[in-house]
Amino acid sequence: MPDRGARRGARRVRLNALQGINDMPKQSIIPAGTGKPLAPYVPGSMADGVVYVSGTLPFDKDNNVVHVGDAAAQTRHVLETIKGVVEAAGGSMHDVTFNMIMLTDWANYAKVNEVYAEYFPGEKPARYCIQCGLVKPDALIEIASIAHVGQ
């Protein structure tokens, strides 16, 4: 019959190893002037020098859609918001390595890309772009980003 104490000890070792995973330092990134989000999340989160920027919509601090009907202006607003999160974490837009872009209408793709190119003039980050519905009907774009800003 196996020794129950040995099994319990082995389980404790496994649990202690797993607990170490949760001890990794994580920091919330909330730039000054940020409004209350619509759901339980923060604008950005940083761990091990990597900044994860939440899906960013063209909202003012009161969660109202700005620049209704203007995809270019909404894109600029979203990218400025992302820039604020990345800079609050100590980085720059040059540190952005990946963007996830969500559009409500492919007809806005060229306008979005024109503004996007202004924020990423040199080496471009990887990205994908999909068409989908967004949380508010007047929002035409949402972008989530990943940036590597170092330790």
UniProtKB/Swiss-Prot annotation:
What this protein catalyses is:
(Z)-3-aminoacrylate + H2O + H(+) = 3-oxopropanoate + NH4(+)
Question: Please, which domain of life does this record's source organism belong to?
Answer: Bacteria
Q: Which Gene3D superfamilies match?
A: RutC-like
Q: Which InterPro entries match?
A: RutC, RutC-like_sf, YjgF/YER057c/UK114
Pfam family membership, one: Ribonuc_L-PSP
Q: Which UniProt keywords apply?
A: Hydrolase
Q: Does the keyword Cell division apply?
A: no
Return one Gene Ontology term, BP aspect: nitrogen utilization
What enzyme category does the UniProt record give?
A: hydrolase
GO CC, any one term? cytosol
Single Gene Ontology MF annotation: deaminase activity
State if Hydrolase is listed as a keyword: yes
E.C. number: 3.5.-.-
Q: Which HAMAP family match?
A: RutC
Report the protein's function.
Involved in pyrimidine catabolism. Catalyzes the deamination of 3-aminoacrylate to malonic semialdehyde, a reaction that can also occur spontaneously. RutC may facilitate the reaction and modulate the metabolic fitness, rather than catalyzing essential functions.
Q: Which PANTHER family match?
A: 2-IMINOBUTANOATE/2-IMINOPROPANOATE DEAMINASE RIDA, PROTEIN HMF1-RELATED
Family, according to the entry, reads as follows: Belongs to the RutC family.
Full protein name: 3-aminoacrylate deaminase RutC
User: Which organism encodes this protein?
Assistant: Stutzerimonas stutzeri (strain A1501)
List the gene name. Answer: rutC
